[in-house]
Amino acid sequence: MARILVTGGTGYIGSHTVVELMQKGYDVVIVDNLSNSNVDMLDGVTSIVGQRPPFEQVDCNDAVAMQQVFEKYTDIEAVIHFAASKAVNESVEQPLKYYRNNLLSLITLLEQMQVYNVHHIVFSSSCTVYGQPSEEHLPVDETAPIQMALSPYGNTKQINEEILRDQAYSDANLHATILRYFNPVGAHPSAMIGELPNGVPQNLLPYVTQTAAGLRQQLKVYGNDYNTHDGSCIRDYIYVVDLAKAHVKAVERMLNGEADEQVEVFNLGTGRGLSVLELVNTFMAVNGVDVPYEIVGRREGDIEQVWAKPDKANQKLGWVADTPIEEVLKSAWQWEKKLRSL
């Protein structure tokens, strides 16, 4: 089977994707500098698939180190690029860090791919490129207008998409698949891998699970005066395992020569919007635990409501995110309990 280079492969989505690739029989090599992930994730991956994936502790911005990776693994046929700094709030405080890490890593990768004749890349993008879509663009499909980014993080995703398009235009051999994720949640059903925030969680569900586990006194719900049915923000929460499977489908589509265009874009979501309060209440109901929460003021930069229209991915990738949210929320709690030995 083909070898797939996975940058950021010890991270949350990366580790789940490595599992799906290996279970499909692909050879992988993980590149990660461990700046916002933990090498222990490799133990979890090994427990699930029965084999330890090759791992290189390398910064994707380091051209010499990346060159050595391509020299060592001469059978790489595709790259899945997850490695990035990803905290929206931090990006506002440290924009240069985000522009350096997120732009330079992709540029370095594309340069090495060109040298070593690797022609397929899957890029980890985000629904943040759509900003707050107007009502006529809900649910959001791939033709929705790209809005001005609300953070340097979001801006790096937009710029990287343009870099990929420009590079593909200049290199007829390059094929890129841009995957715009909605809100990844949950953990592998084995509870061997899951979301492991370094420091303060950036996403809602780790806050919920940590509050349920007693690590936090109460959850803050930012705003209950939005123009939604219960006043809280609405998001499209997609199970991380379903999301990981979409990456395998995207790689296969390119390697099989099935792509319609040199650069393809897919929205990855469930097609269903769920409010913050619905998520919290469903979590409590399915897990039989209490999550104390308080309503506080809106958080700057939060989008009111966004959810995907995933028809294109359903049809062209032959993929669907259909794991019930109840199962997803149970998986998140199993992972948290394992982490805390509860």
Q: What would you call each of these model-derived segments?
A:
Residues A65, T108-Q112, D242-K245:
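Conserved mid-core alpha-helix of short-chain dehydrogenase/reductase
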Residues E93, R100, L104-E111, V129-N183, ...:
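Catalytic helix-loop patch of NAD(P)-dependent Rossmann-fold dehydrogenases
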Residues D62, S105-T108, H120, I159-N160, ...:
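Conserved cofactor-binding/catalytic machinery of classical short-chain dehydrogenase/reductase
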Residues E77-I80, V122:
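N-terminal Rossmann-like NAD(P) cofactor-binding module of classical short-chain dehydrogenase/reductase
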Residues A2-A78, V200:
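N-terminal Rossmann/SDR dinucleotide-binding element
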Residues L205-L342:
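C-terminal substrate-binding subdomain of Rossmann-fold SDR/epimerase-dehydratase oxidoreductases
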